[in-house]
Amino acid sequence: MSEELFKKREIKEEKRENHIYISISQVLSYLSAPFDQQGVAKRTYENNFNNPESQYYQKTIEEIIEMWSAKGEVSMQYGKNLDEYIGCVLEGDESDVELYNLDHDTENDSRLSHHIRAFDEFYKVLKSSGYDFVTREQDVAYESKNKIKIGDKEYTFTVIGRFDALFYNKETGRYLVIDWKSSGSIDTMPKKYTGNLLGPAKIYKDLNWYTYTTQLYFYKTALLESNMLKDTTDYKDVDVRIVNLPDHDFEDGNPYCSYSPAYHYNKDFLDSVFEFAVKKKILLDSKKIK
């Protein structure tokens, strides 16, 4: 990590009266309507039970849900394995990478090998574009100056999270915050039944492209508002990218895909999203107490 470019700060959740801490992942979860797992599984069962070509052929609703759960656990493990590899490349040396490949038997794991190839190809392009690695997996926090009133109480709040990686381009003087994705796809186009996000984000479709963008913009806000970057508090100096490193090639033959933000940065909009999420958290928590 370059101490000259990044000022690490210790994030502590201090107990303060009527002060709410909320993670960015919780913020994002409040933006989407709850997933109706049982309902979707039922429709999947009805559409595929008698189809011998379907992976859900002769599967019960319970078995379908179990399949989804198992698939999610496997994807999560591969995501962790990829993060470990990225750490070896960015923070280690060639021997660290060799040891990783040996321990994970990457030669005989086609899925992990593809995740790795996707990262290697992207990182090669990134370096050729003039970007140097700064740091990775750092905790950040954004304490809003705004207050939230519910009933006769006023609340303050802090949003917390951890970004994947930060790079810097000496030629342009610009930073780049990256969020790695390794499972599923980045949905950029709505389908027939795609709804909208909730609260102030209802102007956007319920696509992960929008929620991932919101996540990255939180990191950007936290880095700048906390003065964690060298010589800049200007939002124009920090770019963000969603980088998908899946287990398969895309239609164009590329092993990875880099996505620009789904919408333009707007701090007022982000503040409204954070305030919405905090209000929702307070109200939902109060219902649990009752």
What feature does the model see in each segment?
Residues K205-T213, Y217-K290:
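Metal-dependent nuclease catalytic regions and adjoining charged, substrate-binding loops involved
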Residues N108-R111, H115, Y204-Y212:
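Residue-level preference for long, well-ordered alpha-helices that form the structural scaffold
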Residues I64-E66, L197-K202:
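Short glycine/proline-rich turn/loop motifs
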Residues V27, L31, A41, Y45, ...:
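Generic structural signal of hydrophobic/aromatic residues within well-ordered alpha-helices
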Residues M1-Y85:
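Charged, glycine-rich intrinsically disordered N-terminal tails and low-complexity linkers that flank
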Residues A70-G199:
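Catalytic cores of nuclease domains that cleave nucleic-acid phosphodiester backbones
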